[in-house]
């Protein structure tokens, strides 16, 4: 049993979690939006409303019933397409991490980007998708990820369900909101939330494996999830010492 403990310790300690730093990495985080993001950590297990109505980038009606229940986990990103500040940096960091998970959008997971600005149009969403997102991540088919707009009622309802707090600042003429990735199970339940302006590829991979409920991941992913716990203070998976001691 001691040898098993040694193997697990070696595997976890040598894991590249919290080592690779992608674009947009910055230790300094906005305190206000970080505090806003803390609310998201209380929504684990909450189901999103499948009847919420949006419009996709092609101008077609879209409800969350078109995603849930499904066969793959979903990465939900809330923000807005015309954001002049943080959103672009966060998206770049997210796609950098997703692109290094060895998991494929469309095949292994799906991506959902929803605007919190009720004034944004499908045309804005389509232009943003074409100009920015496609350059950052290869996708397997048009439906592997969707970009949506919606009215204030539906977007605010979705945001509230996943604990995503935001407000319009008259001072800056921008929406203030936390930078985050929200991982949903194939049934549409919040499985994990990472609140940060950068994302480690191994953390993102483990969050996807965790959200998949057993359909994704290899043996070592499962070992890591048994030996690591998600630490909301660091927004990262870290060594669960008590678990290892029990194994030993």
Residue ranges and their predicted role:
Residues 2-55:
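N-terminal targeting signals for export/organelle localization
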Residues 47-49, 69-73, 106-111, 142, ...:
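Extracytoplasmic
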Residues 56-57, 184-185, 231-232:
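Short, acidic, Ser/Thr-enriched surface-loop or helix-capping motifs
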Residues 64-94, 111-112:
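Short active-site neighborhood of thiol/selenol oxidoreductases, capturing the structured segment around
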Residues 91-155:
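Structural microenvironment flanking redox-active thiols in thiol-disulfide oxidoreductases
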Residues 168-225:
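Extracytoplasmic/lumenal ectodomains and periplasmic regions of secretory and membrane proteins
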Residues 231-248:
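Juxtamembrane/start-of-transmembrane alpha-helix segments at the extracytoplasmic/lumenal side
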